[in-house]
Amino acid sequence: MRIKIFPKNEQAFSKFFIVLSPLLFLLLGIVSLTKEAFFIFAGILPQNNFLNSGLLEKLNNHITYSLILSFLIIFLTVYLLPKTLGRKLIIFPIFFLTSLGVIGLESLDLLLGVLFPNNFLFFGNTSFTSIFKILIFFAFVGLVIINILAKKEPSLFVSSQYLFGASLFYLISLMIYRGDFVVFSDNFFINSMYVSTHIYVGYSFVFLSLLHFMITKGINATLYSKTLGSIGFWGFLFLLPWTNFKFYFGSVLPNWIENISLYLSISLSLPLLATTVNFIRTVTTRSDENNIIYSLISFSFGIFVITNVFQIVSSLTNIIPILSLTNFEIAIRYGYVFSAILISVSFIYYLIPKIFGREIKFSRLESITSFFLKFVVSVTLLSNALIGVVSGYSWNAGANAGNPTIYGEGYSLLWSLIRTPLTLNMFLSLILLFAFLLFFVSVLKAVVNGDITEAETIELTEEELPV
């Protein structure tokens, strides 16, 4: 097996992403476990400028919300966009260099954050590279637009609509996020806009782009309704960017934007219902009986649905005062991120024989990997939601009783309630790291020692185009 430094086409470039994906997931697992350990055992483990809970939190945020997200957007664009446009990518050498520039700058941010922790923002970006990231991603979006305008098909397929939306909102979020502001409300407002556009929309659209591809080409099914697909796309496009403001309910944000966020979050039920009906009716027509790929797709969709149900339920006026400014919002972020990562695992399994021409045998190793991933993601999602509910209720009860839970006896009581699920999260991070290690071994085994099979060709016919 050889991977050329300068690939000649999209198919050759995709090999780079397939090989690198398990390594990035492993990096995420290592940093996540280290962060959880330094938080739980802060009084035992040594703390210094390079190993402390605060810096590890920022490193974890950057890997999760920036490095992996940008990597997935580039990965999907390289492979899916030419298939949905019916032609090869225009000016591919420039596209290749721009893609490497995006991933390279996000990786450089990680290194600069470790070397200059004072310039490392909470979500992981640094002030050194922000303007360069905006420029290089602007060039990437421009190249995507040029290719879309040169498409050979009369309309843009649903998976490409979501993919282009993810790229556009990623660029918008880069222009939004800056350092700390003097006015406290400005920090809340900017952080909320960043979380909504970058994490909620970015990861949701990556997931939905992959979902529409995998439920058609991945499991050989026929999309039930393009109309429902369009309803889902435009619904999530207009509603998701507003949904994070509600988690600052009762803070210094204006009431009107909190109320808009509450109403629009409830409205997520419409695109969610359209997408759910489309998914259920589509998968009933599948002809591929690969249980591992199908189970990962179905489970990731279930996580996505639960995450959006959390968004809707938290918008009820008698519930949001309890859940604002708690871990419940982190649970929602986690759901969007790991629904995309889970379906990415199934996508990589699907691509290995297509790109490398190596058959992947779905043995006990792949079954165990799938089980651990699904177990960790589901339990961690519920654990973070539970922490949010318990801490929010305790804060409100303590404030009403005149015994605040941010210090003293009230804080000790709150910590006794949430310490167990927080410790559970640390052990779940250990299992997640183990699952990612198994996934790395699975991919490596298939790429190196898998039986030779027929790889797909770069030519695209009308019959091969996905929905």
Regions found by a protein language model. Give the residues of each.
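Short, intrinsically disordered terminal tails adjacent to the first/last structured region
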Residues: 1-2, 462-467
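Surface-exposed loop and adjacent secondary-structure segments within mature catalytic domains
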Residues: 183
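Short, Lys/Arg-rich, polar N-terminal cytosolic tail immediately upstream
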Residues: 1-9
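Hydrophobic cores of alpha-helical transmembrane segments in multi-pass integral membrane proteins
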Residues: 14-46, 50, 54-114, 127-147, ...
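Long amphipathic alpha-helical scaffold segments
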Residues: 285-290
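Non-cytosolic membrane-interface motifs at loop->transmembrane helix junctions
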Residues: 119-129, 155-158, 186-196, 253-264, ...
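Internal maturation/activation junctions in enzymes
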Residues: 284, 317-318, 325
